[in-house]
Amino acid sequence: MTLNSLPVWPALQAHYEEIRDAHLRDWFAPANDRAPTRAERFTFEGGGLAADFSKNLITDATLALLVRLAREAGVEARRDAMFAGETVNPTEGRAALHTALRANSPDAPFHAQVAAERAKMARFADAVRAGAWTGYTGKRIRHVVNIGIGGSDLGPKMVVHALHHVATPDIATHFVSNVDGADLARVLERIDPQETLAIIVSKTFTTLETMTNARSLREWFVANGCPEDALAKHFVGVSANPAEVVKFGIAEANVFEMWDWVGGRYSLWSAVGLSIMIAIGPERFAELLAGAHDMDEHFRTAPLERNLPVLQGLVGIWYRNFFGAQSYLVAPYSEALHYLPSYLQQLEMESNGKSAQIDGAFVDYPTSAVTWGEPGTNGQHAFFQMLHQGPTLVPIDFIAVLTPEHPLASHHPKLLANCFAQSEALMLGRTLDEARKIAGPAHPELAPHLTFPGNRPTTTLLVDALTPRTLGALIALYEHKVLVQAAVWNINPFDQWGVELGKILGKVVEADLTAPQVDPAKHDSSTSALIARARKALGE
């Protein structure tokens, strides 16, 4: 049953018409906001996090209808099927058991495999961190280079950056993803082959970008003095295809396994997170997993009415499918979470940017919104102008860490003040009458420019302190939000066929860029002209 054919759909449409012109300013007015206040009614906790939904365009009736939508759409059944290891990725015939990677019960699916691989990771990480694993000249490892792309890069990079304050200072971690040689070249300028460990991460070990960078890095090692028979001291592989890893030249003992029942964008909890474990240590990696498990249990057991991933997903549906929001913003007021927006871009848009329903029918309603963001306060000086005074509705997730993870504590009240003030300003706005008073009788023409419509919806997520455990919970919150929305939209969030066509045509174009001759009729006129210009520049 599709979204707009569910029994609750007409009631939601009617409710939207009732409140579409309401203003948050009025709902927060003292005369209307009596005990329990909106903040009290719409703030919920779970997995060590708190979420204030009160500055959203919702009422108690809205949430009741949205929860009914979740039930009618089968959110609970889809959730339970995922945790049970059922085939929730039907187009690829797979389970999606990233939750099993952080489950702490021997009854969890694949528990023995997961525990054995994590123990292998821990032994290796401890050896590298202690200096027992050395390079070909006997020097300890001081640089780790993670080569991967998509889920093999975004998650580990985000976590290593976020947990820099608890990472070992003895090892610098670098990430290379882009096939543009500049990405790898800039890292090569900063590392010494005698002290560098490369982690090559690819589910298939055939990914174009990853294998191109891996080959170039291997050539660099040899060109800079590493004997070929000593490369085993400097290369390890993470893959679901161990045979290809060995074929590449990595020693079998240096292969770490991931599994096809873990999607790439959900894989940082697996051996894909080896760079994380080396940076922060096995004990803190276990805390990262524990935090994600905390949120798993909250998602699995909390009533829908107080379930953070469910509420977050449903509020997103409310704006996407009723208010017509084209995008939503993630604004972490934490420089440590600098890479969270780019991580969430893949998590949300690669998962739910689909037009085909599970049964193959095409949707006739919007699915994934564009996800974007930048840490605060940087974003305030870039695009917040549009958020405050532009005509486009952009719902926002603010993320605030209440205690700093760095020694410059005097900065932190300023950071938090900006976060909370932005949510208040976006909600309240400034009326034309208020603007006229500010402009004064000498400059009445400025009043329209000083007017803020307000009524811009925001959710504020609060984290007491940024630790491996709270970070794990935060990531899992967004993972489960994606599943909730996928269930409501009746789509499969665990495949990504949309990346395939470009890959196929890319191989054809790459061959044409270096071929002796190219048939201009092989491509459309635009692509043929682009190839011709590139061939000329490349000297072909």
Curated annotation (Swiss-Prot):
One of its GO terms (cellular component) is cytosol. It is found in: Cytoplasm. The keyword Kinase does not apply. Its main location: cytoplasm. Pfam families: PGI. It is an enzyme of class 5 (isomerase). Its EC number is 5.3.1.9. SUPFAM superfamilies: SIS domain (SSF53697). GO terms for biological process: gluconeogenesis; glucose 6-phosphate metabolic process; glycolytic process. InterPro entries: G6P_Isomerase, G6P_Isomerase_C, Phosphoglucose_isomerase_CS, SIS_dom_sf, SIS_PGI_1, SIS_PGI_2. It catalyses: alpha-D-glucose 6-phosphate = beta-D-fructose 6-phosphate. GO terms for molecular function: carbohydrate derivative binding; glucose-6-phosphate isomerase activity; monosaccharide binding. Pathway: Carbohydrate biosynthesis; gluconeogenesis; Carbohydrate degradation; glycolysis; D-glyceraldehyde 3-phosphate and glycerone phosphate from D-glucose: step 2/4. CDD domains: SIS_PGI_1 (cd05015), SIS_PGI_2 (cd05016). The active site is at E350, H381, K503. Keywords: Cytoplasm, Gluconeogenesis, Glycolysis, Isomerase. PROSITE patterns: P_GLUCOSE_ISOMERASE_1, P_GLUCOSE_ISOMERASE_2, P_GLUCOSE_ISOMERASE_3. It comes from the Bacteria. Catalyzes the reversible isomerization of glucose-6-phosphate to fructose-6-phosphate. Belongs to the GPI family. This is Glucose-6-phosphate isomerase. It comes from Burkholderia thailandensis (strain ATCC 700388 / DSM 13276 / CCUG 48851 / CIP 106301 / E264). The lineage of its organism: Bacteria, Pseudomonadati, Pseudomonadota, Betaproteobacteria, Burkholderiales. The gene is pgi.
